[in-house]
């Protein structure tokens, strides 16, 4: 077993198209790159269990064996494929399960949620041994407005309010954002104030192509969303949204992360239009707002600024919940960058890995905040 699993340091998991990597000793002069684990598998998401930091669940996809949830009990060193997988009932879609996009744990660690393609939300109360369909969302009256977007039709973002776990917010591409205040018994569309320029109605109730939704860990009222048409903030748990795109070089992007201590501090990586889908002007730039999106500035020192045509995907950026100011992101070219100062200076952690699908901070001595 690698010494990282017996050490007290923190690690960054990097899920890629060809397996899972682990970067340890983040505070050392020479961080250690380990892996690949789950070699040959697409690792779309990784989530630890609160209170059991070395227990990890991963959303996995393979061209032969399909989509599964995998479990590790030793910090990612060894993995077991769980027999059960979340899927729609036969006949509802052409394929009950194409891929598993996102996993989320309730603060007490008792429930595991999964978002899948075709778009649907599922939960397990027995650590993935069995799954239940959240029918109230998956058969919502507005589902007729949902549709695939460039081949993707997934529920890709799951936010759980840590102060009120019955408050849930999810993002669907392309379906929009939905919220529940009763643990998923009932759901309301949460898209008021959000543009949908690709639809006949500019401000529809549902059907939006949302790329990412995040909730502040200390204040479930504060949400941010990256969309096909703009970046937005909500101050009331998703009931209403304010566009905060002004000051950014584009209104398109995927990756966004908020500061775990200050809900007004948010970082994001804009991309160039819905057609190019790479960094704007061939420059890898991160933008930060310190006032909830009223103003933005580039915080890109240490990042390449010439002929960089890469993509940073929706789960490929993360904020460290236990170390204020530490963020990481990975690119489609397999480069991973880290900052310890909210973007004021970036360092290269790894390069030329397979395409990065997700990054996730974890701590052996603590828990995912």
Where are these regions (language model features)?
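Extracellular glycan-interacting surfaces
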Residues: 1-369
């Amino acid at each position: 077993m690698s010494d990282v699993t017996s050490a007290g340091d923190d690690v960054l998991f990097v899920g890629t198209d060809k397996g899972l990597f682990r970067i340890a000793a983040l505070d050392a002069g020479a961080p250690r790159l380990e892996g690949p684990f789950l070699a040959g598998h697409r690792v779309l998401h990784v989530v630890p269990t609160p209170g059991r930091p070395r227990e990890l669940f991963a959303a996995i996809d393979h061209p032969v064996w399909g989509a599964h949830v995998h479990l590790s009990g030793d910090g990612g060193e060894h993995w077991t494929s769980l027999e059960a997988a979340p899927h729609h009932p036969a006949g509802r879609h052409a394929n009950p399960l194409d891929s598993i996009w996102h996993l989320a744990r309730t603060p007490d660690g008792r429930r595991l949620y999964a978002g899948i393609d075709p778009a649907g939300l599922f939960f397990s109360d027995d650590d993935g041994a069995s799954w239940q369909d959240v029918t109230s969302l998956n058969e919502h009256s507005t589902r007729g407005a949902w549709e695939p977007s460039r081949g993707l039709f997934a529920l890709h973002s799951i936010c759980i309010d840590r102060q009120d776990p019955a408050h849930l917010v999810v993002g669907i591409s392309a379906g929009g954002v939905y919220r529940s205040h009763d643990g998923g018994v009932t759901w309301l569309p949460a898209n008021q104030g959000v543009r949908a320029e690709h639809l006949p109605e500019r401000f529809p109730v549902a059907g939006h192509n949302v790329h990412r939704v995040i909730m502040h860990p200390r204040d479930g009222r504060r949400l941010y969303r990256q969309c096909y048409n703009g970046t937005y903030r909500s101050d009331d748990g998703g009931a209403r949204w304010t566009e905060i795109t002004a000051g950014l070089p584009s209104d398109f992007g995927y990756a966004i992360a908020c500061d775990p201590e200050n809900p007004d501090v948010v970082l994001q990586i804009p991309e160039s239009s819905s057609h190019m889908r790479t960094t704007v002007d061939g420059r890898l730039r991160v933008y930060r707002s310190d006032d909830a999106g009223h103003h933005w500035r580039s915080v890109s020192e240490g990042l390449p600024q010439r002929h960089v045509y890469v993509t940073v995907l929706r789960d490929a950026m993360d904020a460290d919940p236990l170390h204020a100011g530490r963020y990481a992101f990975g690119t489609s070219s397999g480069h991973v960058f880290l900052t310890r100062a909210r973007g004021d200076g970036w360092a290269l952690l790894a390069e030329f890995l397979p395409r990065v699908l997700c990054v996730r901070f974890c701590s052996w001595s603590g828990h995912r905040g």
